[in-house]
């Protein structure tokens, strides 16, 4: 999956994007990071809570993907390092089959 596809899923507020997780392949511990979308909140886009102290939330997908909250860099900045684990709580491999990627 490329950056534009994942960003578009969040920007269009697609179903089943909450609890999306990934790690950075440059991290030897492969620590998981979480992002998601919960439409019932004023700031529906979120990151962290388990990996970012006190979590982080915002109003738009653009803010989420461009915020320098991952060691001073954004998802957009670090895209080439990202390994997707799951999207919407579904393993990425299974998700690709279900969504024909």
Language-model features and meaning:
Residues 15-50:
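Amphipathic, interaction-prone secondary-structure segments
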Residues 5-9, 26, 30, 76-81, ...:
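Unusually extended, aromatic-enriched hydrophobic runs near protein termini
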Residues 9-12, 33, 67, 87:
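Low-complexity, intrinsically disordered/propeptide-like segments
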Residues 12, 42, 58-61:
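Generic cytosolic/nucleocytoplasmic N-terminal low-complexity/intrinsically disordered segments
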Residues 55-101:
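Mixed-charge, Lys/Arg-enriched low-complexity segments
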Residues 7, 38-41, 49, 53, ...:
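Generic alpha-helical secondary structure signal
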Residues 1-18:
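Short, basic/low-complexity N-terminal boundary segments at the transition from targeting/disordered tails
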């Amino acid at each position: 999956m490329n950056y534009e596809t994942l960003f578009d899923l969040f920007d269009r507020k697609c179903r089943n994007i909450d609890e999306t997780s990934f790690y950075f392949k440059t991290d030897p511990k492969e620590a998981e990071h979480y992002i998601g979308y919960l439409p019932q909140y004023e700031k529906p886009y979120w990151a962290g809570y388990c990996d970012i102290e006190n979590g982080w939330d915002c109003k738009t997908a653009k803010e989420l993907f461009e915020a320098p909250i991952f060691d001073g860099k954004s998802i957009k900045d670090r895209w080439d390092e990202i390994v997707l684990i799951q999207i919407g709580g579904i393993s990425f491999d299974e998700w690709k089959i279900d969504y024909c990627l």
